[in-house]
Swiss-Prot record:
The organism's place on the tree of life at top rank: Viruses
Described function: May act as an apoptosis inhibitor.
Acidic residues: bias regions: 613-624
Keywords, alphabetical: Coiled coil
Coiled-coil ranges per UniProt: 320-351
The organism of origin for this protein: Ostreid herpesvirus 1 (isolate France)
Organism lineage string: Viruses, Duplodnaviria, Heunggongvirae, Peploviricota, Herviviricetes
Protein name: Uncharacterized protein ORF107
Biased composition (Basic and acidic residues): 362-388, 409-418
Stretches the record annotates as Disordered: 274-322, 354-436, 602-624, 649-689
Transmembrane intervals: none
Amino acid sequence: MFKITGVVSFIDDDPNAKVKLNSEGRFMEIPLKMAQRFLNNNNDRIKGKKKKIPILFNHFNNLPQLGTVDNLEIIERGVNDNDGLGNKKRKVLQMTATLSNRSFIKALQESSHFYNTTDKHMEYYSPDGFLSGGNSNPSGEMVTGRSAIMKRFPGLSIGHLDNDGYDIEEISLCYAGARPGTILTDASYSDHCGLAEDDTGSNSTAFLKAWAAKPFAMMTSRAGKIAEDINMLGVKNESLVYGLENKEDDVNDKPLPPQQPIDQPIDVEVMKSSLPENNKEDISTTKDTTPNEVEEHNINTIENEISSPFTQKSPDELDTETMSRIQDEVKALAAESASLRDDIKKYIAEALVQKDSGSSSVRRDRSPVDRRDRDRTPPRRERRRRDYDDYDSEDDYEDRRPTKKLFRRSRDEGEFLHSRKNKREHSRNRFDEFEDSRFDEEDRDMYRRRPTPQQSFYEAQSLPRRLLKRQVIQDDFDEEDYYQVRKPAKRQRVIFEDDLDEFYQPPVQQRRLAPRAPVYQEPQYDDYVVVPRQKQQQHVLPAASQRRVVRPQQLRPQFHDQDVEYVTIDPQTGMEVEYEPVAPAPKKRVVKVAQPVQRQVVKQTQPRAPEPVEMEEGEIEEEEEVVEEQLAPVKKMPVPKAVPVKRAEAVDAQPTPPQAAAPTQEYSFKKPTGKTTEAHFDELMDQMF
């Protein structure tokens, strides 16, 4: 995968300029308004409203696209004008794109691999993994994905629509673009796949054919355009392609002799082969020459060159001015050659002195390989053995590292650890000395589980017994110590503090084989708010600081567990019912006659005082539950006084339901001390609320 950056087009300096087209109908520079419209369209493409701008190869629609445009932006860049005006800032439209076509990358890898292995016959190395193989160390020529793509396809070209807006349809990667300054400025290869591992490019042959179909003359004709763009934007030299030649080539430039490092001795034979044949004798012999002899020798050499058949004029035909100029040049060359000869003799003398003195050891120390052998770190085993030497003995070493001694098993313990029992006892004895001193009793309580509001009643059963025995209504109960603080629930039931004792019920005895009794279905409240009773305003809840929230599982935990077998208790005898569950007794009502009931009778009698109603022992007069019988009004008779009717006669005249004749049951507001049932609990709830 390639990440490329390049200039797509220059922006006109005039902000109000219009689109300027050339003779072929192409715009060389775009106005600022058009660039802004290109940016807005590209933002819509990035957001997914439109398709992204594709990247093609040389405007070939029959080949698959190379990638898509990631971003378009307007920046200011320094531009070197080719007309000699110098460097100045200009606005350009810059593109950032991603090339993800595996076929194109594979074709680029194959062509680079063929060029570096077959054509150049040189060693190479690829630090970014663009080419597989090569040298592992940085030796030879460096071949990267950046150099491969910028040496072959450094140009960019816009493919626009022929409409009024000239909207961008695609951007192509090509040999050279037609607009000025449209080249790649940067490229990076980030996929370390290599040539051998890249097997996904099935259309790489099509790209290779497209590259081979281009005539050489067409590619070389674009060389001048690429050179101008490179000089204009100041791109690195690795973008120079197609064998660009130096225009200011000097004919007198000759290759210099190969330079050798100072540390190594100079080979005299190599130096002789690099110098002219006439100067070989001067180096081999130690005879000193005077400047006059050198000047005469150079003059003779130049005369021989002038008299060669390649010259158009003979020495006699040369004028005086030309001869004087040649003599000046010869003198300058003679001075340079004399200084060069002195330097060569100096280097040879130093090399001979170093060879005689035997200073090769110094050069060996300068070698990085020998320095690595001298300062190499000891192996792993040597480092471990060196740690043992720091202590007095091996036992002292083990005492300072008790963790290694715990889990180390010696050969003598093999027979002892053979049986499972001995192995278990041995492992337990190994940690006895650390178990007692690791935690105190108070520290161990910190690691016990704490109940949370999210835990059900089942999970609370697995907690330590001392937490279950803790009373909920104690004054020193710290809620934050055992429960998480949360916001008040939506559904709350208000319970007064003086009624909390009656509301709390002890858990029912559990028996495994007892029949299931009907379970009281309590309304689903999130929690209960316990508030102090106020005499004047009972309907107003106190402040939040005076409230005390009690969870449902604290008040009645037995009714939140639907899988517990309950035992039915007879409330009168207090004995356990073995097999038949006792149904809840019907509610009883006590009827109290406040005034004697008068009825119309045929027989006229004298009125009598009403007989008092005899209350059975244990009955309670409840004024709230008085039943007043609605009877017809009594008609006045000519008899002066009416005859009262007894309660028995009234009952005979209008019988009551059989529930009224059933025996009543005594109710008490005291906290029950014995076993109760769900029916008894319902009765207590009716009395309280």
